[in-house]
Amino acid sequence: MMTSRLPSCFGLRFYAKRAATIRAKPSKLASSVGIGAKRSKKTVKKKGKEVDIFNYGKYVGLKERDPGSETKGKELLDKLSSFDQLKILPEVRNSIKNIIKDETLSKKAKESEDVIPSPIQLIAMKKLSRTLMDPKLQHHAIAAETGSGKTMAYLIPLFDYLKRQETEFPEDWEFMQDKAIIRSVIFLPTHELVDQVYNTVKKTENDLKFHVYKWDSGTKYPEIVEKLKNRIDILITTPAKLLNLFNIRMISRADRLLSEVKFVVLDEADTLLDKSWVEDTHRAIRSLPNTNHLLFCSATIPNDFNDTLERLFPNTIPITTPRLHKLPKSVDFKIIDSSINPFKGSKIKALAQTLYAIANDSSEPGFEKRCIVFTNEKKDVPYIVEKLKVTYGHDCIGLTSNDSVEERLEKIHDFITPPKPITMKKETPKIENEDSVEVEGSNITIGDFSSKTSVKNSNSESSLKVLVSTDLMARGLNFQGVRNLVLYDVPQTSIDLIHRVGRTARMQQRGRVFMITDKKTKSWAKALPKVIKKNMTLK
C-alpha cells in the first residue's frame, strides 16, 4: 500500500481571515471522522482488531473515521430492522413505503409485503426522532455510502416533522395553512438533482397532501410569484435561486415568505459548502432565521467540508453508517491495462473493446444495457464520443457543462429511468480480424486491433447505450439499474473515486466498474480490486 507524502491541505481561503482570529471548537462530526489523524496511519485499533485504511490518490481527501462511531452504528443496526420500530406517524410510514416500493428496480422488493429500510434510514430517523419537535435549532450531518438511500433518510424526518406540525399544533396549523409561506427548503447544487428529488417528493401530494414546488432554471418569475401566493410545504431549489427572491420586484417582502421555514436540508452538502458555493449557500441559510432543523447530507466527508462545518456550524451532530468511505461490496472492479498488446498504449482502443465486450456478454438478458464513461477533463468528452461513434460504431452521447439544463436532462433520460426491454434481436458492433486474447485479472476478451480497424453494424440501434461525461454527472444522480461503468481516466482523489463508482451498484444491486490504466498509473490505483475485497476504508 502506497502512502502519499503530500500535505493534507486545503482549508477554505474565503474564511482564512476569520479562522485566524477565531478558532472554533472541533465539531462532533470532526471527531467522528478522526480529526488530526496522521497521513501515514494505515490501521486503527477497534477492540483488539485492526481496521484497514487505504490512502488513495495524490492527496488525503477524506477524514479518517472514528472506529467508535462505526461500532455504535453497528450496535444500533443490530437492534433495528423495520420501519415499524421507528417513531413515525402511520400515514408518513405508509407513504414512505409506497415511494420506496415504487422506485425500486428489485422485482422481489416490489412483490414483498413489507419494505425494509436501509441502514442510514434506520439510524437517521432513530436519532432525529428523539428531539424532532424540540423547538431549539438543531444541526445534523447525515453521511453514508453512495446508493444507500440517503435521500429518503432525510425525507422521512422532514415528512414526519411537517405532519406533526399539523396534528400536534392544530391552532398554529389553522393559522398558517392558507398563508403565503414556505415551510421547508431542500437545497441541491444542480438542476438535474432538483428535478430528481422533486420527482420523488411530489409522490406525497395525494396521500400526505403536501404542496411541493421546484424552482429550477426553467421557472419564469411570473410562475414563481403566482405559486408563492399560496402555501408551499416543500420547496426544492438551489441556494442561488432562493436568494433571487430578494431581487424579484413583484415580491415586496421575501423575508416574510421565508419566516416560517423550519426545516432545511443541504443535499450534496460537501459540494454546497465548497469554496465555489459556500458564500451563496451561507447567505441562503442566513435568510432563514427561524430554522428548527438544519440537515447536511453527503456521501463523503472531505477535509475542506469538515473544516467548514467546524467554523460555521460547530455543534453539528454526525449521523453515519459503518460503510462510510467504502466502495460498494456489490461492485465487480476490473483493471484494463491499455499499455499491453494489442492496445499498444491506446486508451481509446481499450475503451472501445471494453464496451464491445459489455455489449456482447450474457448479462442483463432481455434488457437494453447502459454504460457511463467518466473522464477527468471536459475537453476529452467530444473526442471520446466521436471516436466511439465514428470509428467503433457505438451508440454514444457526450454531456458537459456546455450543455443547457434542458439538453442535459434529455441526454440523461435513458440512464436515470429503468432499463428498456429489448423486443428484437439487435446486432452489436463486430470488430474485424478478431484473435481472442484474455486480459489477466479482468473478464475482457480482446480482439486484434489495428489502426484501420472497422466496425460492422447493420443495425443503427444497439443494445448498449453509452454516456460520456465528467464529474458533472458523478454527484447524487440515481442512474437506475446502470450496471456498467468505465473510468477512462483514473480518479485523482478518493472523493472523485467514491462518487464515480457510486453511480452503479446502488442499493445492494450488482454493478461492474472497468478502470483503464496505462504506464503512468500509480500503484495505489491498481490496488483497488483488493481494497474492495478486503473491505477497506478509503482516505
Curated annotation (Swiss-Prot):
May I ask which residue range the UniProt record assigns to the signal sequence?
none
The biological process GO terms on file are: mitochondrial large ribosomal subunit assembly; RNA metabolic process
Any one Pfam family match given in the protein's UniProt record, by short name: DEAD
Summarize where ATP binds, as residue positions.
144-151
Top-level lineage group: Eukaryota
Cellular compartments annotated: Mitochondrion
Task: Return the transit peptide range from the UniProt record.
Answer: 1-24
Keywords (A to Z) from UniProt: ATP-binding, Helicase, Hydrolase, Mitochondrion, Nucleotide-binding, RNA-binding, Transit peptide
The record's comment about this protein's domains reads: The Q motif is unique to and characteristic of the DEAD box family of RNA helicases and controls ATP binding and hydrolysis.
Task: Specify the protein name.
Answer: ATP-dependent RNA helicase MRH4, mitochondrial
Q: Which organism is it from?
A: Vanderwaltozyma polyspora (strain ATCC 22028 / DSM 70294 / BCRC 21397 / CBS 2163 / NBRC 10782 / NRRL Y-8283 / UCD 57-17) (Kluyveromyces polysporus)
